[in-house]
Curated annotation (Swiss-Prot):
Topology of this chain in the membrane: Single-pass membrane protein
Record has Repeat as a keyword: no
Alphabetized InterPro entries for the sequence: CcO_II-like_C (IPR002429), Cupredoxin (IPR008972), Cytochrome_c_oxidase_su2-like (IPR053624)
Compartmental location: Cell membrane
Family statement drawn from the similarity comment of this UniProt entry: Belongs to the cytochrome c oxidase subunit 2 family.
Protein name: Quinol oxidase subunit 2
Main location class: membrane
Superkingdom in the source lineage: Archaea
The EC number(s) this enzyme carries: 1.10.3.-
């Protein structure tokens, strides 16, 4: 058997084996969950500064009274921000100038986005329904800053806004 006569068949078999190897490899990683995570790319708890993590732990273990969505813990404002159908709760956050802010962002219904332009830059993150996301920032200039839902999820999503009011 001359290899030149059967080069096309050999090439086909080699490529078929490679395709089967890569296909099997991907099936294995997808079926075991090793290649996909809903946390990938999302702002998670571990990405917060250590003091912010401690404040979130305290906030979670000592939740504020009903109707209260924020609490100052060790000089840091911790806000539980929830996105529901076409609104944010709360939709107004009042913070002192240069006061660190930690947002605990929840969305029980749909994927949402959070977009806030501050003098120091943009905070833009996504939130997957049912998975908590976190944001940490400090605004050093008084004023009103509007955040928006950056993920279009349906009718009136573009009107989902809120305001960070920086005083002092």
């Amino acid at each position: 058997m001359d290899i030149k006569e059967h080069a096309e068949e050999v090439w086909f078999i080699v490529m078929l084996v490679l395709v089967l190897i890569f296909f099997s490899w991907n099936v294995y990683y997808l079926s075991t969950g090793k290649s996909f995570s809903l946390d990938y790319g999302l702002p998670t708890y571990s990405g917060l500064p250590e003091q912010a993590q401690k404040a979130v732990q305290y906030f979670d273990s000592h939740p504020p009274s009903p109707g209260q969505y924020s609490e100052v813990i060790n000089g840091m404002l911790v806000v539980n921000l929830t996105a529901t159908q076409y609104k944010w709760t709360p939709d107004l956050i009042v913070v002192n100038k240069s006061e660190p802010v930690v947002l605990i962002i929840n969305s029980p219904q749909v994927d949402t986005g959070f977009y806030l332009r501050t003098p120091d830059g943009v905070i833009n993150l996504n939130n997957v329904a049912g998975i908590t996301s976190y944001a940490y920032f400090v605004i050093n200039q008084p004023g009103n800053y509007t955040w928006r839902d950056a993920e279009y999820a349906g009718y009136n999503s573009s009107y989902m806004t809120g305001t960070v009011e920086v005083v002092g």
